[in-house]
Regions:
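Periplasmic OmpA-like peptidoglycan-binding domain that tethers envelope proteins to the cell wall
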Residues: 28, 34-52, 56, 73-151
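Periplasmic peptidoglycan-binding/tethering modules of Gram-negative envelope proteins
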Residues: 1-66
């Protein structure tokens, strides 16, 4: 069952990356498919992606008593709305909504799950080069949710 996580997820969705790390398994989801701009509500496609990942991970996390962190990351464009005064709130809310979806209906155990918001503090790609120019594709890459299954 664990092998199914590695079976070319990029073939199904180019915004899903799976990587084996020292700390565990890291699944990176591009947030453009998960959420609308400035929103923390999972889109229909986002719900489907999260449900599929949950179906694959539930037995692994439960049977082996592993822990799961869901990290929300944003780009460096500030958000200022009533609901999200900054990217901190947006990233935390996105992570929480993914955890909620993964733990509802007896999925991943709640007590083995954490939601963490990083805003734009841990970019996958630095948004600007040494001259201060925007790096093409950096903002898209930095808007993401990472699911880390700790060994």
């Amino acid at each position: 069952r664990l092998d199914s996580i590695y079976d070319n997820p990029e073939d199904d969705d180019p915004d899903v990356e799976v990587e084996l790390m020292k700390r565990g398994i890291n699944i990176t989801l591009g947030s453009n498919d998960l959420f609308g701009s400035g929103s923390a509500t999972l889109s229909r496609k986002g719900r489907g992606i999260v449900e599929e990942i949950t179906a694959t991970l539930t037995d692994i996390v439960s049977d082996y008593h592993l822990t799961m962190d869901v990290e929300g990351h944003t780009d460096d464009v500030p958000i200022r709305s009533f609901r999200f005064p900054s990217n901190w709130e947006l990233s935390a809310s996105r992570a929480a909504n993914v955890v909620r979806k993964m733990t509802e209906s007896g999925g991943i155990p709640k007590e083995q799950s954490r939601a963490i918001g990083f805003a734009d503090m841990r970019p996958k790609i630095e948004p600007r080069d040494s001259t201060g120019a925007l790096v093409r594709g950096a903002r898209d890459a930095n808007r993401r949710v990472e699911i880390i299954i700790h060994y």
